[in-house]
């Protein structure tokens, strides 16, 4: 499954919607996504499982890439 993760680049500042970034992670569950990202230096706001149709749409963006540690 592919998950879209919305996050802020820093843990030290209050989250601001306009600064929200996103990345895509392949994992078995939302819990696994959070475990994979727990040591990263950013604040996770939301993790969303995306549908096949949503994934196809996102892949049309030339900047689309799965996160790799």
UniProtKB/Swiss-Prot annotation:
Q: Name one GO cellular component term.
A: DNA-directed RNA polymerase complex
MF terms from GO for this chain are: DNA binding; DNA-directed RNA polymerase activity
Enzyme Commission numbers on file: 2.7.7.6
Alphabetical UniProt keywords: DNA-directed RNA polymerase, Nucleotidyltransferase, Transcription, Transferase
List, in alphabetical order, the GO biological process terms annotated in this UniProt record: DNA-templated transcription
**HAMAP family tied to this protein:** RNApol_bact_RpoY
Q: What does this protein do?
A: A non-essential component of RNA polymerase (RNAP).
Q: Which family does it belong to?
A: Belongs to the RNA polymerase subunit epsilon family.
Name it: DNA-directed RNA polymerase subunit epsilon
Organismal lineage: Bacteria, Bacillati, Bacillota, Bacilli, Bacillales
């Amino acid at each position: 499954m592919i998950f879209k993760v919305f996050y802020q680049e820093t843990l030290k500042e209050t989250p601001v919607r306009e600064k929200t970034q996103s990345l895509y992670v392949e994992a078995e569950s939302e819990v696994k996504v959070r475990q994979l990202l727990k040591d990263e230096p950013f604040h996770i706001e939301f993790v969303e499982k995306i549908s096949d149709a949503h994934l196809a749409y996102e892949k049309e963006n030339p900047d689309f890439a799965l996160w790799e540690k």
